[in-house]
């Protein structure tokens, strides 16, 4: 599974500005989803890879980013 890492309180994606390989995104994806996860910056959001199927990713139901 893949997807944008999301703040469960706000419903917002984690923003990034250095597109492609991005240490911040990799660190955040691994912290939230485990050491096996990958991450990079895609379309100014942190995109996580190698997630377990039940992983929660953006968008969240009933939560809009404000």
UniProtKB/Swiss-Prot annotation:
Subcellular location as annotated:
Secreted
Stored PROSITE patterns: LCN_CSAB
Task: Identify the residues that the record assigns to the LCN-type CS-alpha/beta domain, covering every copy.
Answer: 1-66
Signal sequence, start to end = none
Modified-residue entries (Asparagine amide), positions: 66
Disulfide bridge map:
12-65, 16-41, 25-46, 29-48
Which GO MF terms does the UniProt record name?
sodium channel inhibitor activity; toxin activity
InterPro entries attached to this UniProt entry? LCN-type_CS_alpha_beta_dom (IPR044062), Scorpion_toxin-like (IPR003614), Scorpion_toxin-like_sf (IPR036574), Scorpion_toxinL (IPR018218)
Question: Which CDD domains does the annotation name?
Answer: neurotoxins_LC_scorpion
The protein's matches in Gene3D superfamilies, at most eight in alphabetical order, are given as: Knottin, scorpion toxin-like (3.30.30.10)
Q: Which UniProt keywords apply?
A: Amidation, Disulfide bond, Ion channel impairing toxin, Neurotoxin, Secreted, Toxin, Voltage-gated sodium channel impairing toxin
UniProt note on tissues of expression: Expressed by the venom gland.
Q: Which GO terms describe its biological process?
A: defense response
Where is it mainly found? secreted
Q: What does the protein in this record do?
A: Beta toxins bind voltage-independently at site-4 of sodium channels (Nav) and shift the voltage of activation toward more negative potentials thereby affecting sodium channel activation and promoting spontaneous and repetitive firing.
What's in the domain note?
Answer: Has the structural arrangement of an alpha-helix connected to antiparallel beta-sheets by disulfide bonds (CS-alpha/beta).
What other remark does the UniProt record contain for this protein? Answer: Abundance in venom is very low, approximately 0.3%.
Homology family:
Belongs to the long (4 C-C) scorpion toxin superfamily. Sodium channel inhibitor family. Beta subfamily.
**What is the protein named?**
Beta-toxin Chui2
> From which organism does this entry originate?
Centruroides huichol (Scorpion)
